[in-house]
Amino acid sequence: MKYYKTKIKRIFDKENKVLGHANGEFVPNGRFYFDRIRKDEIIEDAPVFDYFHLQSFDKRKFWEWRLQDVHGFIGIFPMFCIWYISDKLKSLLEKFRIAPKYHFYETRLLYKEEKFKYWIFQFPIGGFHNYNYEKSEYFIDNERILGIKTAEEYDEYDYKIWKETKKNIEWRKIVLIDKFDIVDTWQGDILCSERLKQAIEENGIVGFEFFEIDYEVVAE
């Protein structure tokens, strides 16, 4: 399965504008719920979070200049959630094997005095446990790192290396235990399978950019 790095399109040079992102500062009890989501809790009985609004670092009059199927977050929101998505995109994602664990939270987005149904996409939860660390290939100073078996061991080693040397571990091959259409990586990339990328483009989903990656990703 081929993967692409995917990013939210945020900067528009031709229009000289930046994308507005979702701020949940007006959601009742939002901080309480968002903190629980931040800690990877799945809240099955969460209320509809009403409402978010778009905001950017540009002038206020440009906050709502563009609406996409995917936005990021700003201000008050559940930390570590990175996609705020339209109902159309949610329906598409549900047709795929998204991630080992994930959840959608229904919200309302106030946009140009009208409310739209948007969703907080809580993902991936525990995605790094889907890695085979013994078969994956990652290096420091061109020397392959061996002996790591779990996500916790890798995280501890990564922190130690950064603290002592300020160097990043270089990944050359990710081996996944199971196949999913969205993969998070230790280097910060969010990967999208070729078939999901194709479906996004064919269904006119607006807001993503896709890039080739310079490392290998395989599933056992």
Residue ranges and their predicted role:
Residues M1-E220:
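Phosphate/anion-contacting hairpin/loop surfaces
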